A protein has these predicted regions:
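Short, polar/flexible loop-turn hinges at active-site or ligand-entry regions and domain interfaces
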Residues: 1-6, 99-100, 121
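Short glycine/proline- and charge-enriched loop/turn segments
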Residues: 19-24, 75-77, 90-95, 149-155
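Active-site acidic catalytic loop and adjacent metal/ATP-binding pocket
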Residues: 35-93
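Regulatory N- and C-terminal appendages and interdomain linkers associated
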Residues: 160-178
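A cross-family kinase active-site recognition segment
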Residues: 1-42, 48-56, 84-85, 152-165
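Conserved beta-strand->loop/alpha-helix structural units within folded catalytic cores of enzymes
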Residues: 65-67, 124-127
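Active-site activation/catalytic loop segments of kinase-like enzymes and analogous catalytic loops
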Residues: 89-120, 132-152, 168-171
């Protein structure tokens, strides 16, 4: 069940409520202090969009391998663990992070999406969510790393996540001009 306090009452609450949740998760899972991430959190609070173009279902972390195809049609999607109600710009930030811009120019893809769907993507919100999705990805990887460090899960992949998370940290530093 989705906690009631996470359901946006209107378009002004989308980003703020999700940020409050991820701030809590970040402080619960970080195995050690990360001053750059603390700075990123301050940046996210300061730049948090005041309005979303509407409340939409946000899938989150949509990689190109998560579609289930039947012929030329997508008939299902997998990996819904980051789904929530929010700003559709977040899904485009995840897509950009996953490399969709290598297939076609991101601006052209978003223009096409806006024309077909009628849903507008605010460029300022997209820029914000490009940092926020990196913050989320870093936090998720730290959660796995923490389980490894604590001895709760000894899969080598989880130990390696700590190294991978630093690539997200570098991107955050670059995007926030730290």
């Amino acid at each position: 069940l989705y906690p009631e306090w996470l359901i946006p009452g209107d378009e002004t609450e989308c980003a703020r409520l999700d940020l409050e949740l991820w701030e809590q998760i970040f402080y619960e899972v970080q195995p050690e202090p990360y001053p750059a991430m603390t700075y990123a959190l301050s940046w996210l609070k300061e730049k948090c969009p005041q309005r979303s173009p509407g409340i939409r279902l946000v899938k989150g972390n949509n990689a190109m391998t998560e579609e289930i195809w039947q012929g030329t049609r997508i008939v299902a999607m997998s990996d819904w663990e980051l789904t929530h109600l929010g700003d559709p710009a977040e899904d485009w930030a995840w897509a950009a992070q996953q490399g969709i811009g290598q297939l076609w120019e991101l601006d052209k893809i978003i223009d096409h999406y806006q024309q077909v769907s009628g849903i507008q993507i605010d460029p300022g919100n997209l820029a914000y969510f490009r940092v926020f999705v990196l913050f989320k990805a870093f936090t998720c990887l730290q959660a796995g790393s923490r389980m490894f460090i604590a001895g709760n899960d000894r899969r080598v992949q989880l130990g390696a996540l700590a190294f991978l998370s630093h690539t997200f940290l570098e991107q955050i530093v670059k995007l926030t001009e730290l």
